[in-house]
Each structure stands twice: as structure tokens, then as C-alpha cells.
Amino acid sequence: MGSARRALSVVPAVLLILVLPVWAQNDTEPIVLEGKCLVVCDSNPATDSKGSSSSPLGISVRAANSKVAFSAVRSTNHEPSEMSNKTRIIYFDQILVNVGNFFTLESVFVAPRKGIYSFSFHVIKVYQSQTIQVNLMLNGKPVISAFAGDKDVTREAATNGVLLYLDKEDKVYLKLEKGNLLGGWQYSTFSGFLVFPL
């Protein structure tokens, strides 16, 4: 009799373990990552400041909004005298990709979360006798630069790329330190994306 009671008390616990994953899988479709299946068990998890969440089962789950990418071009020449604010920020008037909308109309990328991000830029100088210098800025400080200064070449490119560790709300943009850019055929571009969140 005692063993029968013990067997009955175990049955509800076993049923709970078997039923809960089936219920959770109905709310969320599996996500395939490198040939393996990851099932998110909570369709409305509470997200912390790092973008991670914890389901009722105590499983830590990455938020699904980790897709971040932008790419923009400049369609006109860019001369510092034309910039009314005199910040020398390079503005890109045509946004080709802006997944997540984190690249602003002011041509500043604002990081939505902590992570490793990739940035690249390609700019062309306007005048043969001029040198251009472009800095990629992080929160107002230069991180990398690119130069183009061959006096015998009319259209010369300044190009660079970098991986950066960013915190949420960090701001990344391009600043023209010297010279003028050519943009009439979308020669100047600026792109970036989230490599992985932290």
C-alpha cells in the first residue's frame, strides 16, 4: 500500500515534466543554429539589460532582436563649407539597409545593445591636388583613420574597417578631418553590423 501511494505521488511530477516542454514548443518555433536545434521555451520572456532572458524553466535565452545592420551611400559631393553645423560629420543621404533602424537620419549609428560590431567605410576624394582624411569616431573620439593623398590621381579611395566592442547607446559615425569627398555616383559608403551580442 505504501509503495502504491509513493508511485501515485510520483506520477503528477512526471506528467508535469512531460507536458510542459510540449506546451512550450507550441508557442515558439525552433531556431536552427549550425545544424543544431534550439527551442525557446517562453514566448514572452522578461528581458534584462543585456538582452538575455530567463524562461520559467530557468533556461537563459538570447533575445531574438539581435539582427542589426546598416549600409548607406552619399549621392552628392561633400564639402565642409556646405555643412551648416560645422561638425564635419559625413552625412549619407541614401540608406540602403537599416535593419533595426539604429542608423539615424544624422548618419550616426547608435548601438542597441552590448556586443561586437563590424564597421567599414570607403570614400573618394574630389580634387586631384587634395588629401582627404576620414576618421571613424566612437563617442566623439577617433578610433581608426583612412587617408588618400596621391597628387597625381583625381579619384583616390580612402578605405578602412574595424571590429569594435560597443556598449548600449554608444555612437559611431564618420568625420571628415581634411579635404572633400566625391559622391555623385555613390562612391562614398558606410556600413556596419552586429557580429554577435555579449
From Swiss-Prot:
Q: Which domain of life is it from?
A: Eukaryota
Keyword Glycoprotein attached: yes
Q: Which UniProt keywords apply?
A: Disulfide bond, Glycoprotein, Secreted, Sialic acid, Signal, Synapse
Q: How is it modified after translation?
A: Sialoglycoprotein.
GO cellular component, alphabetical, reads: extracellular region; extracellular space; GABA-ergic synapse; glutamatergic synapse; synaptic cleft
Domain C1q spans what residues?
63-198
Q: Which GO terms describe its biological process?
A: inhibitory synapse assembly; protein secretion; trans-synaptic signaling, modulating synaptic transmission
The principal localisation class reads: secreted
One of its Pfam families is C1q
Q: Where is the signal peptide?
A: 1-24
What Gene3D superfamilies has UniProt attached to this entry?
2.60.120.40
Tell me where it resides: Secreted; Synapse
The phenotype of cells or organisms lacking this gene is:
Mutant animals are fertile, have normal life spans and have no overt anatomical abnormalities. They have a normal corpus callosum, hippocampal commisure and pontine nucleus and no other gross neuroanatomical abnormalities. Mice exhibit increased anxiety-related behavior. Triple CBLN1, CBLN2 and CBLN4 knockout mice exhibit impairments in sensory processing and sensorimotor gating, in addition to severe motor deficits, seizures and reduced synapse density in the hippocampus of aging mice.
Database matches in PROSITE patterns? C1Q
Found, by tissue, as follows: Expressed in brain with high levels in particular thalamic nuclei. In the thalamus, predominantly expressed in neurons within the parafascicular nucleus. Found in the hippocampus, mostly in the dendrites and somata of pyramidal neurons (at protein level). Very low or no expression in most other brain regions. Highly expressed in the ventral medial habenula.
Describe the task this protein carries out. Acts as a synaptic organizer in specific subsets of neurons in the brain. Essential for the formation and maintenance of inhibitory GABAergic synapses. Promotes the development of dendrite-targeting inhibitory GABAergic synapses made by somatostatin-positive interneurons. May contribute to the function of ventral medial habenula region of the brain implicated in the regulation of anxiety-related behaviors. May play a role in CBLN3 export from the endoplasmic reticulum and secretion.
Subunit structure, as described in the record = Homohexamer; disulfide-linked homotrimers. The trimers are assembled via the globular C1q domains. The trimers associate via N-terminal cysteine residues to form disulfide-linked hexamers. May form oligomers with CBLN1, CBLN2 and CBLN3 prior to secretion. Once secreted, does not interact with other CBLN family members. Strongly interacts with DCC in a NTN1-displaceable fashion. Weakly binds to NRXN1 and NRXN2 long and short isoforms produced by alternative promoter usage. Interaction with NRXN3 short isoform is hardly detectable; no interaction at all with NRXN3 long isoform.
Protein name as annotated: Cerebellin-4
Native organism: Mus musculus
Q: From which lineage does this chain's organism come? A: Eukaryota, Metazoa, Chordata, Craniata, Vertebrata
